[in-house]
Amino acid sequence: MGEETGRRDCILMSDRNVARFFALVRNNDFLDNPPLRPKVAFCRLVAGATVACYERLTVCGAPSMLHAYSGWIELWEIAVPFASEILAHHITSTRFEDLPASAIEHAKIFILDSLGVGISASTADGARELLEASSRWGSGQDALVWGTGRRVPATTAALINAFQIHCQEFDCVHEAAVLHPMATLLPAAMAFAERRSGVSGRDLLTAVAVGVDVSTTLGVASKSPLTFFRPATSGGFGAAAGVARLAGLSTEQIVSVFGIQYAQTSGTMQPHVEGSVVLPMQVGFNARAALESCDLAAAGIPGPRDTFEGPFGFLRLCEGEWDLAPGLAKLGREWQISQVSHKPFPSGRAGNGLIEGLMLFGSELPFPKSEIESALVIGPPLINRLCARPDRPAPNGNYARLCAAFIGAKVLQHDRIGLEHYRDVELTDSRTHELAKLFSMQVDDNLDPNALVPHELIIRSKSGQEWRWRCEAMLASPSRRLSREKHLEKFRTCCGFSAQPMNAGAVEKLIVAVDELEAVQDVRELIALMT
């Protein structure tokens, strides 16, 4: 391109990037602190791109000229930054004082929630085997494996604790991004904090806020159905962001962190389809990689720069159709930790509406459960894709948590569903599998590949009666928040499943410590309460 025009600084500019450029340069907050390469750039417009012939913009208080002619845009004083640079700048420039009260409150809520869920999974399927296997990967006592009393190298702790947070489908979720942002982020951040003393509660809260922003910005950018497992892939970038913030890395170093993390990014939907225990392990692999990526960048290893949007970048290869502009425009304005939802029930989020509807049916009981002929869920393609799998007579827990028929049958039996219903003889209960035959799912006409709502539950009786319930917003989502009482009840219940028993006093002290996290001088105080 340089030979064609006589210009040296030339880059292809798609419709999407043209639009994103204009969105960025009109964002005054962004321009106050531009993480840009200040030079003249000459950007080729690819076929179909359009732009006004002339605009006068103000960049950092100085007028800047932008011309479009003969299929080229001439940008003076400002060039379109890579998304990795924008995200890295957000990480390094955010201070605890920048966080609104709501972001701090929700960061505390989901830190406590994630600790509880992680502790409970110390007795879940696969946890013991993973801990045993990890003993062959090197020795060290950097960090705690939650709920066990065992100490291991920091990278191993990040892997195992991330597995434990996600392996029971009880961890918090960002519905719009279709990912579980804390599952990778908190274990990596806590492992780093244990390895390096002096990480304060304020540091942790800030790291959580920016880490969730990074993973969810990537998640909401996707306009395609899941193929790679986003809680692991995008979640890994969020974990890397959080650790980089705690490590005090520079903007340039964090750009490298993203590139190095991408080189290690892994996780597909195949284990989800099969109900394999490897599904949550993928979350762990990326949490471990986050620590390694930050260590490598801190040691001076440079990574690729155009990690997300490049010709072989993450979004292009792993997400298909995408648009980063809306998410990037929200950085520093709308904190995504405040958009995270609780999991009130231990199942895939796509099954939580079914559970709520069945519990409501049980409380109203318009006709006896013994008279139910069928129970149909009609909803967006995503919930069918995630939970419309056939029941099996002896499923493992990972399969059962993502099987609407199994989930629904358990709720009909017990008017609730808990962690215990995915363990031992509960998985092979013949009555459960008989009731599972009542359930089916049907796709509606929703065109959004990432939508979970609305969906409808229709229960029909043998005599022709019909009961309907429609879910417009998931229980415990931002518009239907879980009460503090229910939040703490969930945490206390989770602690009761710990492999190493926790006394009630320690549980209550941990609640208080997280409530007062901004006053904690070293977050290892939280770990001390878990041992």
Regions found by a protein language model. Give the residues of each.
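Short, charged, amphipathic alpha-helices and their helix-cap/turn boundaries
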Residues: 150-169, 203-218, 253-265, 316-317
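A cross-taxon signal for low-complexity, glycine/charged-rich
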Residues: 3-10, 14-19, 25-26, 34-38, ...
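Terminal-appendage/accessory-domain detector
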Residues: 75-178, 278-288, 295-531
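Active-site nucleophile and cofactor-binding loops and adjacent substrate-binding regions
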Residues: 177-183, 203-208, 224-236, 279-285, ...
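Amphipathic alpha-helical interface segments
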Residues: 185-187, 191, 230-246, 256-326
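Structural helix-adjacent loops and short alpha-helical linkers that scaffold large soluble proteins
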Residues: 196-205, 248-255, 303-306
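Hydrophobic alpha-helical hairpins/lids featuring a short glycine-rich hinge
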Residues: 168-218
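Short, Lys/Arg-enriched N-terminal segments with co-localized hydrophobic residues
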Residues: 60-79
